[in-house]
Amino acid sequence: MNFRSPSLILEPMRILRVSFLLALSGNLLWAAEPKMQPLPAPLSNNAVASLKARGGLRLYSLMGIGPKKKWDAVSNAVYALDPDTGEWTELRPVPGTAGRIAAAAAGARDHVFLFGGYVLDAQGGETTVPDVSVYDPLSDRWSRASDTPVPVDDSVIGVYQDRYIYLVSGWSNNDAVRNVQVYDGAKDKWLQATPIPGTPVFGHAGALVNDTIIYVDGAHRNPAGSQPKYVASDECWMGKIDHHDPAKIQWSKLPSHPGNARYRIAAGGSEKDQKIFFSGGTDNPYNYDGVGYDGHLSEPVAVTFAFNLRTGKWETLNDKTPNPTMDHRGLLVAPHGLVIIGGMEQGQRVTSRVTVLPRK
C-alpha cells in the first residue's frame, strides 16, 4: 500500500493558494491603476500642473498648440485629469483673446498659477506676454495676478514652501534672459532673485524640490553667429535657496546628465523620492513646429533619467523609453508614476496620449 505524506498532499494546495493570491493581488493592482484616457484634444507645448485640493489630486493641461502647428491652432483650453478614474474634465478656458504656447504652470495655495508664454500672429510673429492667471478649482473661476516684471516663455518653474513660485531664465521677446523671478503668492508681489550664472537659455527643463532647483540644457543663440541661429546647451545647474531670504540662491554647476543635451524635455520633481525626473525631449532645437533651426526635422529621444538629491548623482532609468515624446513644459509625479500629457511624437505629430512611466 502506498502512503503519501500529509506534507506532500498539502504542497499542491499551498501552490494553488499562493497562485490564487498572486493573481488576486495582480488584479487588485490593475484595478487600482486605471488607464489614463487621452486628452480630449491633441496638444503640444501645453503647460501642466498638479494640485491636491478638496476634491483630491488633479492633473491639469493648459493651452498649447494643436496638430496644424500654426498660429490658428494655438489653444486656450484647460482640462483636468482625475488620476483615480483616468477621466478628463474640460474646465473654463484661460481668459484672453488668444491662446498661448510655452507657458508655465504650477499648483500652489489651492490654486493653479499660469505664467507667461507667447502668442502667435498670422504672419508668424511671436510676443511674450507678462500675464499671470490664477485658477480656483472650487469655483471654476479665473482671476488675474500681478504681471511678470520680465515676461518669459519656455522657462523652468518651481514652487517653494507652497508660497514662492520661481521662474528660471527663459525667452523674453528678443532673447533669453538670466533672470530668476519669484512670485510671492501670499502678497501678490514679485522678487528678483539671484540670476543664473550660466548661459541664458530657453526650452530648458527642471524642477524645484524642497529648497533645491535643478535645471538642464535648453537652447541659446549660436555663439558663432552663423546657422543655425540657436543651438542646444549642455549646461546643468543646481540652485540652493536661502532659508531666510527666498531671493538668495547659491548656484553651482553640475556634471552633464546621461545622454546628449536636449530641448523641451518633460521634467518634474518628487519630494517623496527626493528626485527630479527627466524624459524625452529632442537633441535638435526648433521653434514650435518641430522643424529644427538647422532645417532638419526634430525627433524625440528615448531616454528617461533623474537627479538623485540624496546622492547628488544622475541616474539613468530607461535608455529605451517606449514611444518617447518632445515639446513639453513638464511632467507630473503622481502615485501612479511619471505622467506626461500630450507633446510631439516621432514624425513631429502632436498627440493626445497620456503616458505613465515608472519612477524606478
Regions found by a protein language model. Give the residues of each.
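Kelch-like beta-propeller repeat domains
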Residues: 31-360
